[in-house]
């Protein structure tokens, strides 16, 4: 089967949707499919084009059997609303010529956000007369409005219209949690158009490892410490000030260290907040290379999932499967009625505390510090749940089955538009 993945983010970006789409593409290739990826120049999370791609309009690559077609992005490191719009539009226009540089796909899968990617992907779908599968990782503009990231009324109206168009244009919509399905059905999307395939984790890559003789611990002088780890995106939805304030509450326990790993620029503001609050038990570190991820997770005693109170209920952090697979207990400072809380509770791999409550977070961390048996129990339950529900192989099975069903059903009837064969062979 020829599969086209249209994703703004892809390897070598270390966090977010990029590792997931990379694993999906490479996993499908290993199963005998031909996969082409149309993507932008790598820039996340620094919001700067990586050095080796800077100044280039188009780059074609082959990695682990996947054909990668990159196109130019207009990007600013500190974007305003106009910059964000121009960034997405630049990808729309520069990625369009890529349609002429590959075989006709049997299916197209588009990751959202960004929403504007719907436009070229839909054009591809029409030209190729093949089904478009919308892979929804976040529901926009609703989620951005809720946390105050998007306030411009014209932009909200535009994105709302684009959201409706995307749902209509897609043959199938894959979502990552049941809460997404409920949201879409409430917006009038037919329930039979939606399939839930959770984000996954490579359980062979991320697995429980001993924290003793751990090189990551040794490098950062954490030997003998009780490490509470937050690693990932630092954005409006997180509110990591809560983590720093919780660390201050536990300064009297010298063994406990909080480690926050994220993009360097975002860490600068947290550094100021640490100094202001006297949080000398917080270690701030830049994002680590992906190959260091298993070692870093193994270095922790507890993993954190952090959200603000106003985060929309269906938000589902992709780091939850990672932490569960690592065999470390989770402390989820998240809204109790949200998708993240439900996922953690269902896994049996963590404890939920009130969001934006440093005292609540500190109390649970201290309880886990004092109770190694509970830590082991939660970690083991979380790992087992990840193996049974979040493995990469299960996700590949479900996507492969979805693609096959869609292609088989369409094969019985001719499309309205003619097939557009770009190349043969």
PLM region descriptions:
Residues 41, 179, 200:
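Carbohydrate-associated surface elements
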Residues 253, 261-262, 267-294:
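Nucleotide-activated donor-binding/catalytic signature segment of Leloir-type glycosyltransferases, i.e.
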Residues 51-58, 207-221, 416-417:
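A short helix/loop element that forms part of the nucleotide-sugar donor recognition site in Leloir-type
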Residues 360, 367, 374-388, 401:
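A short, well-ordered alpha-helix in the C-terminal region of glycosyltransferases
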Residues 238, 287-298, 303-324, 329-342:
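Nucleotide-sugar-dependent
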Residues 1-56, 60-61, 250, 418-425:
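N-terminal subdomain of nucleotide-sugar transferases
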Residues 222-238, 244-247, 259:
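Conserved donor-binding/catalytic core segment of Leloir-type glycosyltransferases
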């Amino acid at each position: 089967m020829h599969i086209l993945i249209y994703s703004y983010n892809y390897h070598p970006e270390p966090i977010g949707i990029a590792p997931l789409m990379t694993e999906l593409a490479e996993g499908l290739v290993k199963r005998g499919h031909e996969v082409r990826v149309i993507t932008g120049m790598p820039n996340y999370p620094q919001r700067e084009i990586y050095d080796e791609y800077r100044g280039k309009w188009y780059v074609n690559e082959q990695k682990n059997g996947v054909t990668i077609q990159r196109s130019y992005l207009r990007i600013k490191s500190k974007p305003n609303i106009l910059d964000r719009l121009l960034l997405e539009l630049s990808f729309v226009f520069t990625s369009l010529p890529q349609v002429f540089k590959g075989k006709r796909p049997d299916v197209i899968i588009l990751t959202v956000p960004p929403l504007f990617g719907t436009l070229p992907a839909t054009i591809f779908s029409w030209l190729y007369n093949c089904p478009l599968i919308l892979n929804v990782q976040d529901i926009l503009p609703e989620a951005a409005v809720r946390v105050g990231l998007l306030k411009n009324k014209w932009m909200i109206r535009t994105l709302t219209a684009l959201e409706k168009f995307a749902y209509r244009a897609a043959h199938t919509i894959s979502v990552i949690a049941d809460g997404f399905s409920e949201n879409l059905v409430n917006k009038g999307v037919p329930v039979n158009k939606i399939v839930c395939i959770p984000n996954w984790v490579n359980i062979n890559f991320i697995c429980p490892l001993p924290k003793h003789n751990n090189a990551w611990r040794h490098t950062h002088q954490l030997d003998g410490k009780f490490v509470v780890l937050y690693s990932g995106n630092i954005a409006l939805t997180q509110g990591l000030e809560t983590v720093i304030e919780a660390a201050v509450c536990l300064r009297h326990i010298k063994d406990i260290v909080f480690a926050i790993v994220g993009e360097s620029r975002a860490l600068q503001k947290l550094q100021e907040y640490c100094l202001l609050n006297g949080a000398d038990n917080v270690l701030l570190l830049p994002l680590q290379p992906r190959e260091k991820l298993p070692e870093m997770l193994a270095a922790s005693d507890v993993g954190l999932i952090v959200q603000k109170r106003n985060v929309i209920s269906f938000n589902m952090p992709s780091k939850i499967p990672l932490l569960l697979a690592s065999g470390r207990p989770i402390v989820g400072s998240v809204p109790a009625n949200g998708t993240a809380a439900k996922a953690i509770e269902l896994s049996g791999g963590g404890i939920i505390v009130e969001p934006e409550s440093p005292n609540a977070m500190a109390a649970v961390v201290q309880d886990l510090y004092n109770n190694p048996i509970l830590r082991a129990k939660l970690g083991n339950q979380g790992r087992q749940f990840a193996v049974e529900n979040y493995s990469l192989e299960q996700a590949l099975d479900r996507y492969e089955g979805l693609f096959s069903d869609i292609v088989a059903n369409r094969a019985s009837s001719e499309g309205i538009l003619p097939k557009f064969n770009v190349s043969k062979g």
